[in-house]
Regions:
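Short amphipathic beta-strand segments in non-cytosolic proteins
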Residues: 278-295
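Hydrophobic/aromatic-rich core segments of domains that either
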Residues: 103-121, 130-140, 145-240
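Beta-strand-rich domain onsets/edges
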Residues: 234-261
C-alpha cells in the first residue's frame, strides 16, 4: 500500500506522488461498490459484538449515550476505506494501556481514557506528509502504517478510540480559513457530552472553542445521513461535497459567540438568482473556489447559517 511504502521510507513523499502521477492508476478508475450487496455478514456480526462489548464493559461506557454510541463507536467503517476485521486486534493491542486507570473513579469519564490513550499513541514513530494524494481512506491498516497526512492520522485515532469504546470521530474544514488546504482533526465527548479536540501528534485534548485557526465552517463526519439537509436540498442537483450529507455542521461548537447568520442582499449580487436556487459560500484556493456551505435563495436575500466571524 501507499502508506506502507512511505512508512518504510523506500521512497520520499515526492517520489511516491510522482509514481502515482506517472503510472496508470487513477482515482477515477475506482468502482463504487455498495456494502449492502457485498459485505460479509460475519464482519458486521463481529463489529456489533465487539462494539457492544466495550460499551458495556468499560467503566466510561455508562457515560456514553446510546445515540453517541451508535454514531461514534458502533460504525463498522469510517468512510470509503477497504473493509476489514479491525476491532478485536486493536482492542487487544491497546486495552492493557488503560488498566492503570480502569478502577479509578475518574475512569467513568471517556475523556480521561482518551487522554491516557493519546499519551501512548503519540510516542510511537510516525511519518507525516502534507503531500499525501487524494483518494479513498486507507482503512484500519493505518493503525500499523502510521503514515500519511492529517486525514490518515485522524483515522488512526478514530480506530483506536472506537475499538476501546471511547466516542470519537473526525471534524474538518473543507478549506482552512488561513490556508489553501482542507484540514482534519479528532474530537471526543466527555461524560457531559462536551466536545474536546486533538490534532495528532499533539497528545492534549482541549475544548473546541480553544481552536484558534480561522475556520469559516466546521463539519463533523457522521455515519448517519443528515436528514435535515436532505430535505432542504429538495432533490436538486448539489455539489459533490454536499450531495450525500454524512456530516453535522458543528461550527457553533467551535465559534462560541463569534458566529451568527450571514445575510447577503440580492442588491449586491453580481449574477441574477431566482427563488429556490442553490447558492454556495466559497473560499479561495489558489486559482479556484471551494464551496464550504450552501443555502437556498429566498425572496430577496441569501442566508448562510453560522459562519465563524460573520
Amino acid at each position: 500500500g501507499l502508506g506502507d511504502v512511505y512508512k518504510r521510507q523506500k521512497l520520499g513523499p515526492h517520489e511516491v506522488i510522482d509514481s502515482l502521477k506517472e503510472n496508470s492508476f487513477s482515482v477515477s478508475q475506482l468502482k463504487w461498490i455498495e456494502d449492502i450487496a457485498n459485505i460479509d455478514s460475519s464482519l458486521l456480526v463481529q463489529n456489533v459484538d465487539w462494539a457492544f462489548k466495550v460499551w458495556r464493559e468499560q467503566p466510561w461506557g455508562k457515560n456514553v449515550s446510546f445515540d453517541n454510541f451508535c454514531e461514534f463507536v458502533l460504525p463498522y467503517r469510517l468512510g470509503d476505506e477497504p473493509l476489514g476485521f479491525w476491532r478485536e486486534d486493536i482492542y487487544k493491542r491497546y486495552n492493557p494501556i488503560l488498566d492503570s486507570i480502569r478502577l479509578l473513579p475518574q475512569a467513568q469519564d471517556p475523556l480521561v481514557a482518551a487522554k491516557v490513550l493519546m499519551d501512548s499513541l503519540v510516542v510511537e514513530q510516525s511519518h507525516f506528509t502534507g503531500l499525501f494524494p487524494a483518494g479513498p481512506h486507507l482503512g484500519p491498516s493505518v493503525v500499523s502504517w502510521r503514515a500519511g497526512s492529517c486525514r490518515e492520522f485522524a483515522d488512526l485515532v478514530v480506530y483506536v478510540m472506537r475499538a476501546l469504546g471511547i466516542p470519537c470521530g473526525t471534524d474538518y474544514m473543507a478549506m482552512r480559513g488561513d490556508n489553501n488546504v482542507p484540514h482534519f482533526w479528532n474530537f471526543t465527548l466527555d461524560k457531559d457530552g462536551k466536545t474536546y479536540i486533538t490534532e495528532f501528534p499533539d497528545p492534549n485534548w482541549k475544548r473546541a472553542v480553544s481552536m484558534y485557526n480561522p475556520k469559516a465552517k466546521v463539519y463533523r463526519n457522521t455515519y448517519g445521513l443528515n436528514w435535515k439537509d436532505v430535505k432542504r436540498q429538495q432533490g436538486k442537483m448539489m455539489h459533490p461535497a454536499f450531495r450525500k450529507p454524512l456530516y453535522q455542521d458543528v461550527t457553533a461548537v467551535y465559534a462560541d459567540s463569534l458566529n451568527r447568520d450571514l445575510v447577503v442582499s440580492s442588491d449586491i449580487l453580481c449574477k441574477e438568482v431566482h427563488k429556490g436556487d442553490i447558492v454556495y459560500f466559497c473560499l479561495s484556493t489558489r486559482m479556484d473556489w471551494v464551496p464550504i456551505a450552501w443555502t437556498v435563495f429566498e425572496e430577496d436575500s441569501l442566508r448562510f447559517q453560522d459562519p465563524e466571524g460573520s
